C-alpha cells in the first residue's frame, strides 16, 4: 500500500510539472534540452561505468544476446543518443499549432489547437538509450514522463535520469517532469493509474508488450513484434538486392526493423541466393530455408512454419522462394507483424502493387527496412513504433505525444440563437 500511495504522489507531482511545461515557450524548452545534453556529456564517465556494471550482471544472469546488445551503451552509442536529443530541439514545436481557425458567426470564433497529452508512462526492457530519446520528446512536447526500465538496466537508468534532472534544474522545465521507477511492483501499479497517466508506451519483447497491453486500461502505444520482410522480385537488380538484404539483416540484427524473412522470386532465386549466401555466411548469419531454397543451398537448415512467424532479433534469417508477387504479398500479410516490409525490383508496376497491398506501417521500395526509424525519418527521436492501424503509426515522434482541444471565443453568444423557427444561420468561414 505504501508503494501505491507513493506512486500516486509521484504521478500527481509529474502532472503538476507537466501542466507548467505545457505553457512554456519554444525557446525555454529548447534551452532545457540543451542543458540536458550538456549534463549528459558531463556525466558520461558515470553513465558508462554504470552501464558496464549492468552488462556484467546481465552476463552473469545469462541474458539473451539480443537484450544484451540493446542494454550495452558505449560512448559512441551515448554520443549518438545525445545527438538525437539535440536534434529534437531543432524540430518544430508541436504545441499551440492551430489546426482549424473558423468563424462560426460574427464574434464567435472556433480554434482547434494542439496541446500535450499530460503524463506518459514508458516501460521498457534494457534499452537505456530510450531514457534519453523519450525524455527529449517529453520536454519538447510539454509532457511529463514516468520511466520504468528493466531490472537489467537499473544502474544505467539511474545515472541517466540523475543527469537529466540535474540539467533541468537550471531551466524553466521542472525536473519533476521526468521520473524513474525501479521495481517490478511499481510497474504493475503504474499500469493501474488510469486516473493519472494518459498514455503507456511499452518497448521490449513480444511477450513484454502483450503483458502491458493486457494489464492496463490506459491507452497503449506500441508494437508486439517486428517481423520484417525483404522480397526480391523477378525484376530486381541483383546487386542492389544483395546490398539491401545484407544491410536489412546484419546492420543491427537486434533492432525491431531488421529483416527476419527473405522472400525470393523463383525466376531469380538461383542467381540471387548464390550471390547473397556467401555474404551472409561471412557475417555469421544462419539461414533457414524452404525446400526450394535447400535445393539451391544444400547446407541451409530446413525452415518450419514457426520460422515464418518468428522475430529472431539475431543473426538468423528465414528464406522462402515464391512463384509470384501475389504469393509474396500473401505471405507477408499472413505472417508479418505490420511493422516494415520492402520490395526490391526495377518494375515500377510491381512496386506500386506491393506498396498498395502490403498493410504494414512501413512499406519500402529498393531500400533497407532499417530506415523505419524516427531519427532517420527526421523526427529527431522516437518514443516507439506503433503497428496499429489507428494513428499514430510507424515510428512515433513528437506528433504521437500531442492531442488537441477545441477553443471557442464568443461575446455573449448562446446556442438558442441558432435553433428554432427563426434560427440564425452560421457563417462557417475559415480564416
Swiss-Prot record:
SUPFAM superfamilies on file: ALDH-like (SSF53720)
Q: Does the keyword Oxidoreductase apply?
A: yes
Q: Which reaction does it catalyse?
A: L-glutamate 5-semialdehyde + phosphate + NADP(+) = L-glutamyl 5-phosphate + NADPH + H(+)
What pathway, per the record?
A: Amino-acid biosynthesis; L-proline biosynthesis; L-glutamate 5-semialdehyde from L-glutamate: step 2/2
Q: Where in the cell is it found?
A: Cytoplasm
Biological process terms from the Gene Ontology for this record are: L-proline biosynthetic process
Molecular function (GO) terms for this protein are: glutamate-5-semialdehyde dehydrogenase activity; NADP binding
What's the top EC group for this one?
oxidoreductase
> Is the keyword Amino-acid biosynthesis in the record?
yes
Q: Which HAMAP family match?
A: ProA
Which purpose does this protein serve, as stated in its record? Answer: Catalyzes the NADPH-dependent reduction of L-glutamate 5-phosphate into L-glutamate 5-semialdehyde and phosphate. The product spontaneously undergoes cyclization to form 1-pyrroline-5-carboxylate.
Q: Describe the family membership recorded for this protein in Swiss-Prot or TrEMBL.
A: Belongs to the gamma-glutamyl phosphate reductase family.
This protein's name: Gamma-glutamyl phosphate reductase
- Origin organism is Trichodesmium erythraeum (strain IMS101)
Q: What is the lineage of its organism?
A: Bacteria, Bacillati, Cyanobacteriota, Cyanophyceae, Oscillatoriophycideae
Amino acid at each position: 500500500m505504501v508503494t501505491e500511495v507513493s506512486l500516486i504522489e509521484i504521478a500527481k507531482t509529474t502532472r503538476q510539472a507537466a501542466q507548467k511545461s505545457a505553457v512554456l515557450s519554444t525557446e525555454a524548452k529548447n534551452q532545457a534540452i540543451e542543458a540536458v545534453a550538456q549534463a549528459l556529456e558531463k556525466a558520461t564517465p558515470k553513465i558508462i561505468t554504470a552501464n558496464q556494471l549492468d552488462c556484467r550482471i546481465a552476463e552473469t544472469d545469462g541474458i539473451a544476446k539480443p537484450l544484451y546488445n540493446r542494454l550495452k551503451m558505449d560512448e559512441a552509442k551515448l554520443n549518438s543518443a545525445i545527438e538525437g536529443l539535440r536534434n529534437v530541439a531543432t524540430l518544430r514545436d508541436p504545441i499551440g499549432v492551430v489546426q482549424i481557425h473558423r468563424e462560426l458567426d460574427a464574434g464567435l470564433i472556433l480554434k482547434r489547437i494542439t496541446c500535450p497529452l499530460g503524463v506518459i508512462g514508458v516501460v521498457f526492457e534494457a534499452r537505456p538509450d530510450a531514457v534519453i530519446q523519450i525524455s527529449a520528446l517529453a520536454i519538447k512536447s510539454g509532457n511529463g514522463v514516468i520511466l520504468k526500465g528493466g531490472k537489467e538496466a537499473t544502474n544505467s537508468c539511474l545515472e541517466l535520469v540523475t543527469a537529466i534532472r540535474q540539467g533541468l534544474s537550471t531551466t524553466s522545465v521542472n525536473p519533476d517532469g521526468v521520473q524513474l521507477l525501479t521495481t517490478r511492483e511499481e510497474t504493475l501499479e503504474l499500469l493501474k493509474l488510469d486516473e493519472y497517466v494518459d498514455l503507456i508506451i511499452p518497448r521490449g519483447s513480444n511477450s513484454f508488450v502483450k503483458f502491458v497491453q493486457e494489464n492496463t486500461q490506459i491507452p497503449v502505444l506500441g508494437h508486439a513484434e517486428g517481423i520484417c520482410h525483404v522480397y526480391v522480385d523477378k525484376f530486381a537488380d541483383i546487386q542492389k538486392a544483395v546490398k539491401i538484404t545484407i544491410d536489412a539483416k546484419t546492420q543491427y540484427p537486434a533492432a525491431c526493423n531488421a529483416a527476419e524473412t527473405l522472400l525470393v522470386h523463383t525466376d531469380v532465386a538461383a542467381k540471387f541466393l548464390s550471390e547473397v549466401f556467401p555474404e551472409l555466411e561471412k557475417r555469421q548469419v544462419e539461414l533457414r530455408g524452404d525446400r526450394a531454397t535447400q535445393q539451391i543451398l544444400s547446407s541451409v537448415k530446413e525452415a518450419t512454419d514457426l520460422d515464418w512467424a518468428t522475430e529472431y532479433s539475431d543473426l538468423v534469417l528465414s528464406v522462402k522462394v515464391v512463384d509470384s508477387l501475389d504469393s509474396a504479398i500473401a505471405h507477408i500479410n499472413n505472417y508479418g507483424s505490420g511493422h516494415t516490409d520492402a520490395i526490391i525490383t526495377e518494375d515500377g508496376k510491381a512496386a506500386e502493387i506491393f506498396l498498395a497491398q502490403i498493410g504494414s506501417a512501413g512499406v519500402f521500395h529498393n531500400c533497407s527496412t532499417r530506415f523505419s526509424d524516427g531519427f532517420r525519418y527526421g523526427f529527431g527521436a522516437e518514443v516507439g513504433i506503433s503497428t496499429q492501424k489507428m494513428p499514430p503509426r510507424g515510428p512515433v515522434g513528437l506528433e504521437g505525444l500531442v492531442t488537441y482541444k477545441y477553443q471557442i471565443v464568443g461575446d455573449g453568444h448562446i446556442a438558442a440563437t441558432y435553433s428554432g423557427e427563426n434560427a440564425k444561420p452560421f457563417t462557417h468561414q475559415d480564416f
